[in-house]
Structures are given as C-alpha cells and as structure tokens.
C-alpha cells in the first residue's frame, strides 16, 4: 500500500491509501479539488471515503467528490450524517476495504463522536492525536480525551500516526516549554525544523516517537507533573492531562 498526504487549506492533510491496483481510500477530504486532481493525474479509482468527525475542514469536499464518483460509500460517525456520510460506523466495527481489515475506534474528546480508523500500521486519527500534541476539546471532556489517548497508546509502537494537521513545530515549542530537559524532544525539534524549512511534511510519525516527544502521552512523567505544578495520584493522572491541555490552549 502507498500512503499519500495531500496538503490542503492552511495546514490540513487529506490522506489517500492506495493499493497496487490503483484503488484508494480517501480520509477526511476537507476540500475536493486537490483530491480530484490527484486521482485524475495518477489514474486512481477511489473506493470509499472515511470521515473521522464532522468539522468542515474534514468533510467539506465530500459532496463534490461523491458527485464525481456517485456510487462511492462514505463511512463516518453518526455526527457526520449531515455531511455526506452514507454508512455510519461505531466503536469496534470492522470494515473490509481494498483487502484491508480496518478497525473502528471511538475517540471522544475533540468531538463527542470522533472516530479513528486503524489498519496496521496505519492509524487515521483525525484531530485526536497530533505529532507532539493533541486536539482541542471542542465537545468532549478532558477525561474523555485522556482516555482516548490511552486507548491509542495500546497500539503497536510502529503504528503510523496519520493525523490531519501540520502542527508539529508549534507543538514541539510547547513540549520544550513543559519538558525543557527532554533530549529526545530537543533532537526531534531540530529534525522537524529542517523538514519544514524544506516544506516537507512532519507526519506521519510513529507511535514510538510520540511516546518520547508528546507531552500529552507522558502525563505519568514525574518531571512533567512537577513542571506543570500538578503532581497527582495514579488514578487521577487525567487531571495532569487537563492541566496540560489548558496550558496549551493559552500558550
């Protein structure tokens, strides 16, 4: 399988997962034009659209793409039914597409109905997990988002984190702020700076990398707890996450 990230809008990525038969899945098409252009130029036939949540920068291109390919199914959570979804998915559902078994994961937090799609090694996680960061809490609670991230980290460490935005540089600045002595973050920040200077993407990263450099996955880290001024009991680690998310919102 080939994975293509199409940069769109200000900082979005639309993901295409392409098999050797030149068939593909489209994930979170916020706009249609770059998708339709890529499909035409490369003679690729789309077989399905996968939606993670209802925000317009993830669903805005659905109608135009379906107009060009009218028989194509659109999978998504119930919250996307008004944005072109034709097949509602729920937690622990499995899809069989392009010869892949795709597991559906409910990840509430950014929105209440947010879903992710996992087919090893690819995790299409929308706006839940970013490289070195996580999504804002527009609808869900801090505890819901913390639990969603805890679910993600149970996946294999070679999982490719196919998130929907190029936020890595700014996220790493915050990571350095709350974990200033973390050498892995410092080294990775240098790597990302070089990539962005060349206008190259920083995603997908791997879950292994994220466990090292993403403060939102390191809420058990004593240094992090001390630096944010919120040491807590093991059964209340989500409160560290809540404090961290509030800090990031105003950083």
From Swiss-Prot:
Entry keyword Phosphoprotein:
no
Residues the entry annotates as binding Zn(2+) 2:
57-58, 127, 165
Which top EC class is given?
hydrolase
Q: How is the cofactor bound?
A: Binds 2 Zn(2+) ions per subunit.
Please provide the record's keywords in A-Z order: Hydrolase, Metal-binding, Zinc
Provide one Gene Ontology biological process annotation: methylglyoxal catabolic process to D-lactate via S-lactoyl-glutathione
Q: What CDD domains does the database record attribute to this sequence?
A: hydroxyacylglutathione_hydrolase_MBL-fold
* EC number annotated for this UniProt entry: 3.1.2.6
Give the protein's biological function: Thiolesterase that catalyzes the hydrolysis of S-D-lactoyl-glutathione to form glutathione and D-lactic acid.
Question: What name is this protein filed under?
Answer: Hydroxyacylglutathione hydrolase
- Which organism does this sequence originate in? Edwardsiella ictaluri (strain 93-146)
């Amino acid at each position: 399988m080939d994975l293509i990230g199409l940069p769109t809008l200000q900082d979005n990525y639309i993901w295409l997962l392409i098999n050797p038969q030149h068939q593909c899945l489209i994930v979170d098409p916020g706009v249609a034009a770059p998708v339709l252009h890529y499909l035409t130029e490369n003679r690729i036939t789309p077989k399905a659209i996968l939606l993670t949540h209802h925000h317009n920068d993830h669903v805005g291109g659905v109608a135009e793409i379906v107009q060009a390919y009218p028989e194509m199914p659109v999978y998504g959570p119930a919250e996307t039914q008004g944005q072109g979804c034709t097949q509602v998915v729920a937690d622990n559902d499995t899809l069989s597409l392009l010869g892949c078994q795709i597991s559906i994961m409910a990840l509430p937090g950014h929105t209440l109905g947010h879903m992710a799609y996992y087919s090893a090694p690819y995790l299409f996680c929308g706006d839940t997990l970013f490289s070195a960061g996580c999504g804002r809490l527009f609808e869900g609670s801090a505890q819901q988002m913390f639990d969603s991230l805890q679910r993600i980290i149970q996946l294999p460490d070679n999982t490719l984190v196919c998130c929907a935005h190029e936020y890595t540089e700014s996220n790493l600045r915050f990571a350095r702020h709350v974990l200033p002595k973390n050498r892995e973050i410092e080294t990775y920040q240098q790597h990302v700076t070089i990539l962005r200077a060349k206008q190259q993407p920083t995603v997908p990263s791997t879950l292994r990398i994220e466990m090292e450099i993403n403060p939102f996955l390191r809420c058990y880290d004593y240094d992090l707890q001390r630096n944010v001024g919120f040491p807590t009991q093991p059964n209340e680690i989500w409160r560290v996450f809540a404090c961290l998310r509030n800090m990031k919102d105003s950083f």
